[in-house]
UniProtKB/Swiss-Prot annotation:
It comes from Pseudomonas fluorescens (strain SBW25). The keyword Protein transport applies. Keywords: Chaperone, Cytoplasm, Protein transport, Translocation, Transport. This is Protein-export protein SecB. The gene is secB. Pfam families: SecB. InterPro entries: SecB (IPR003708), SecB-like_sf (IPR035958). GO terms for molecular function: unfolded protein binding.
Length: 159
């Protein structure tokens, strides 16, 4: 089959979406005040920073990376800083530009989040801290907010 025939066959089948691989791209953990922090009363405050990025790979393959960065303070001292970059490779065909943008910006991160949350929780407990139970994230709402912000700034593509 030629490339043109392959493209026509894919279009005839309609949109295609397939998760190819999920992996940890980067992982870090710091507990700068250990072991002294373990002897203090535990009154944590949690700050979560969440970011996504995507990159087109060869053909119809796309890499999406979800980064979760957590800084936990006990009082005024940093108890720990943990970060995970959970990535996935997705095969996506037959979507228009708007649908592709939504898929990469909301649908794919939604798939990656449970893996990133579990990896982060495991990392924190291995550091001898209490489990870190992150609430679910509404990536559709975050995507809609980003789309609205970009439209107000005059850009049409969400990054």
């Amino acid at each position: 089959m030629t490339d043109q025939q392959n493209t026509e066959a894919a279009e005839a089948q309609g949109p295609q979406f397939s998760l190819q691989r999920i992996y940890v791209r980067d992982l870090s953990f710091e507990a700068p005040k250990s072991p002294a922090i373990f002897r203090q009363e535990w009154t944590p405050s949690v700050a979560l920073d969440l970011n996504t990025r995507q990159k087109a790979l060869e053909g119809d393959f796309h890499e999406v990376v979800l980064t979760l960065s957590v800084t936990v303070k006990n009082g005024e001292e940093v108890a720990f800083i943990a970060e995970v970059q959970q990535a996935g490779i997705f095969l996506i065909q037959g979507l228009d530009e708007a649908s592709m943008s939504h898929t990469l910006g909301a649908f794919c991160p939604n798939i990656l989040f449970p893996y990133a949350r579990e990896t982060l929780d495991s990392l924190v407990t291995r550091g001898s801290f209490p489990a870190l139970m992150l609430a679910p994230v509404n990536f559709d709402a975050l995507y809609a907010q980003e789309l609205q912000r970009m439209q107000q700034e005059g850009s049409s593509t969400v990054q």
